[in-house]
Amino acid sequence: MEAIKGSEVNVPDAVFAWLLDGRGGIKPLENDDIIDSQHPCWLHLNYTHPDSAQWLASTPLLPNSVRDALAGESSRPRVSRMGEGTLITLRCINGSTDERPDQLVAMRVYMDERFIVSTRQRKVLALDEVVSDLQEGTGPSDCGGWLVDVCDALTDHASEFIEQLHDKIIDLEDNLLDQQIPPRGFLALLRKQLIVMRRYMAPQRDVYARLASERLAWMNDDQRRRMQDIADRLGRGLDEIDACIARTGVMADEIAQVMQESLARRTYTMSLMAMVFLPSTFLTGLFGVNLGGIPGGAWHFGFSMFCILLVVLIGGVTLWLHRSKWL
């Protein structure tokens, strides 16, 4: 493949544009640099920036079929061979930010053995680890190594987030054993996060597996083995997600049962109180009719005797309920 001049990938508002030195390090891309398979270029763009959008729409370095995908049209993880290049769409969890972690960040990549073009709208935190390794001189030396390191970092972030959700489920299960009901909507949000993760991580695992099996010219056998290991690791994470989804279903049933039992206890208590006070209510209502005068109204101890009668009646009903094992 022909070499590319640095001026051809000069985008003023690029997030960064670096030239891999082939030894695990990087240097800023200059206009007079020569980009080839020994010194590939990594161009990272925010496709919402005007200069970046213009470059994506007009550069002859990109096939026409990938322009819309790099500009944000593609969302689900997938991989497509485009002649000598490959278009890859990946998803990342930005779990350490204030954003809702169920909103996965999309990153789109077009690459061949000479250069890498990656685009995003929101920042992809997993790339910070790859950038840090490159700045320290311990990063990838070629395009294949770069892709493996990026996929590894994305999987690390996904695994950490899955582990956090798993810990939340364990805490929730422990609280349920103590009859502690979680706040309303907590379990629903947890289940939604798991389902969204399952929706995007399953095709992403397939992307990794396909990259491991494809005979891409810019990936060697060791890199393919590492990619397969990453796919297997993400597959284990998906198994954990499936188990967590099933556990949230069990917890939802348990929460419903606990709430139903609590409601039944309250209803039972109110029914017992009604049974205890129903006879006394009947007597007070009967005496309160006062059609022919209140019985015993002229007696000095009439009210006291009536109160004693009510106490005895309530006590008798309570004793009967107790012997009947209703109390």
From Swiss-Prot:
What's the protein's topology in the membrane?
A: Multi-pass membrane protein
Q: Looking at the keywords, is Zinc present?
A: yes
Q: Where exactly are the transmembrane stretches of this chain?
A: 274-294, 301-321
- The segments annotated as topological domain Periplasmic are 295-300
A GO molecular function term, named singly, is: magnesium ion binding
Gene3D superfamilies noted in UniProt = CorA soluble domain-like, Magnesium transport protein CorA, transmembrane region
Subcellular location, principal: membrane
- Organism domain of life: Bacteria
Where would you find this protein in the cell? Cell inner membrane
Supply the alphabetized keyword list. Cell inner membrane, Cell membrane, Ion transport, Membrane, Transmembrane, Transmembrane helix, Transport, Zinc
Cytoplasmic topology ranges: 1-273, 322-327
Q: Which reaction equations make up its catalytic activity?
A: Zn(2+)(out) + H(+)(out) = Zn(2+)(in) + H(+)(in)
Entry's Gene Ontology cellular component terms: plasma membrane
InterPro entries listed in its UniProt record: CorA_cytoplasmic_dom, CorA_TM1_TM2, MgTranspt_CorA/ZnTranspt_ZntB, Zn_transp_ZntB
General function of this protein: Zinc transporter. Acts as a Zn(2+):proton symporter, which likely mediates zinc ion uptake.
> Record's PANTHER family?
CORA FAMILY METAL ION TRANSPORTER (EUROFUNG), ZINC TRANSPORT PROTEIN ZNTB
Q: Give the HAMAP family listed for this entry.
A: ZntB
Q: Which family does it belong to?
A: Belongs to the CorA metal ion transporter (MIT) (TC 1.A.35) family.
Please name the NCBIfam families in this protein's record.
Answer: PRK09546.1
**What's the protein name?**
Zinc transport protein ZntB
Report the source organism: Citrobacter koseri (strain ATCC BAA-895 / CDC 4225-83 / SGSC4696)
